[in-house]
């Protein structure tokens, strides 16, 4: 069985607290975008793993392998699997590629073995792999809260067009959170942005990301990319997640295509895409 594992952007991210166990409370608007990996899993006589990216190995650090192990232990699955991962979403990008792959693995094994799960059980399994996995599993525009397990779908009024621009250097999510200063970082108004998306109002000036503050310290290329996008005429420019991808977003397809044309010789990874509204 084959599934697409769609990337996401954080249209805004507010990290407002830290718990005693070190985990952070957040509110975020997350949008799935038309950019994806493909994951194929089939029951096999022996475990096999193939990936078109040599650095994504068959280890416990691989989110797909981790998800399969969790499901095998939880549901006493004794089968072996042939796994083929066609990886397109860059790593250390803030686009949720690894968590999207894990969510796809859950959907596939759930279907193959006809596993019955409540929403609560799905979210519990997802959170064992990563905070973004519950969002990736449902794959709809949403306001996400708590540690990532609280998901409220948002009916987007409009389709938005997006240019992704990623420096070749990445950002460690762990290091970004370690350097996060809640008194100095941005705290965007997430409920206000949610209202604008539902009503179709202009979203100019409503975007923000708490993790830009530490990410800028870890990777100055992110600052440079933001400046270049703004110089090219982009109005809504933001880093996604913990970076290092920066995006600009607009309702006007041609506006984003024009900016893409101006950025084509920048030397960065560039991709034009759009939101998935359903």
Q: Where are the language model's segments positioned?
A:
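DPxDG-like acidic metal-binding loop motif
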Residues: 93-119, 123, 135
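ATP-binding N-lobe of GHMP and related small-molecule kinases
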Residues: 1-93, 111, 115-120, 156-157, ...
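Conserved, helical-rich catalytic subdomain that frames metal- and/or nucleotide-binding sites
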Residues: 49, 138, 143-236, 251-264, ...
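Short hydrophobic/aromatic beta-strand micro-patches
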Residues: 247-249
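Glycine-rich beta-strand-to-loop/alpha-helix junction loops that act as flexible
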Residues: 97-98, 239-244
């Amino acid at each position: 069985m084959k599934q697409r594992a769609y990337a996401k952007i954080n249209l805004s991210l507010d990290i407002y607290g830290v718990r005693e166990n070190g985990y952070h409370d957040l509110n975020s608007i997350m949008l799935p975008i038309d950019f994806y990996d493909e994951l194929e899993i089939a029951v096999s006589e022996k475990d096999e793993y193939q990936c078109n990216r040599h650095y994504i190995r068959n280890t416990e650090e691989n989110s797909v392998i981790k998800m399969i192990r969790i499901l095998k232990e939880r549901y006493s699955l004794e089968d072996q699997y042939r796994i083929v991962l066609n990886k397109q979403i860059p790593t250390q990008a803030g686009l949720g590629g690894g968590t999207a792959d894990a969510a796809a693995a859950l959907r596939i094994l759930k279907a193959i073995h006809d596993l019955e799960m409540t929403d609560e059980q799905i979210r519990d399994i997802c959170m064992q792999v990563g905070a973004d996995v519950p969002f990736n599993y449902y794959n709809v525009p949403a306001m996400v809260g708590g540690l990532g397990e609280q998901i409220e779908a948002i009916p987007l009024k409009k389709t938005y067009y997006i240019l992704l621009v990623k420096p070749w250097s990445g950002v460690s999510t762990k290091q970004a959170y370690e350097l996060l200063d809640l008194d100095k970082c941005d705290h965007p108004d997430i409920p206000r942005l949610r209202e604008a998306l539902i009503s179709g109002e202009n979203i100019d000036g409503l975007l923000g990301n708490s993790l830009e503050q530490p990410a800028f310290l870890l990777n100055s290329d992110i600052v440079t990319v933001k400046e270049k996008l703004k110089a090219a005429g982009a109005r809504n420019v933001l880093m996604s997640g913990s970076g290092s991808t920066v995006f600009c977003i607009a309702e006007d397809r041609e506006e984003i295509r024009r900016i893409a044309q101006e950025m084509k010789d920048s030397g960065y990874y560039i991709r034009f895409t759009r939101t998935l509204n359903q």
